[in-house]
Amino acid sequence: MAAAMTFCRLLNRCGEAARSLPLGARCFGVRVSPTGEKVTHTGQVYDDKDYRRIRFVGRQKEVNENFAIDLIAEQPVSEVETRVIACDGGGGALGHPKVYINLDKETKTGTCGYCGLQFRQHHH
């Protein structure tokens, strides 16, 4: 149940500005909770009386503001000639298992399930 709540929280839109966005759109970047604490990429934020805040006594909570989902969203869609593309995330130790993406479906754009890179078939 807790995992489902966390996933649902990730899908929520952030702020009033997001109301003008299309239904599937999401806001990216660091959000701030009502207490002024930065929210992590997983939506983690603690209440004022939460016992888990003890780890931040005497120091500030550090949140990396360069979320990977933001960096992937900045990548343009790659145009390829073939109808099946293999994505390995860059290969080697920095990549992920090789997956094959079929680009002749109705979606017209294929997205890698591991790294989020998008591919589109270039028709000539």
Curated annotation (Swiss-Prot):
Residues 1-28 form a transit peptide. The keyword Transport applies. It is a peripheral membrane protein. It comes from the Eukaryota. GO terms for cellular component: mitochondrial inner membrane; mitochondrion; respiratory chain complex I. Mammalian complex I is composed of 45 different subunits. This is a component of the iron-sulfur (IP) fragment of the enzyme. Belongs to the complex I NDUFS6 subunit family. This is NADH dehydrogenase [ubiquinone] iron-sulfur protein 6, mitochondrial.
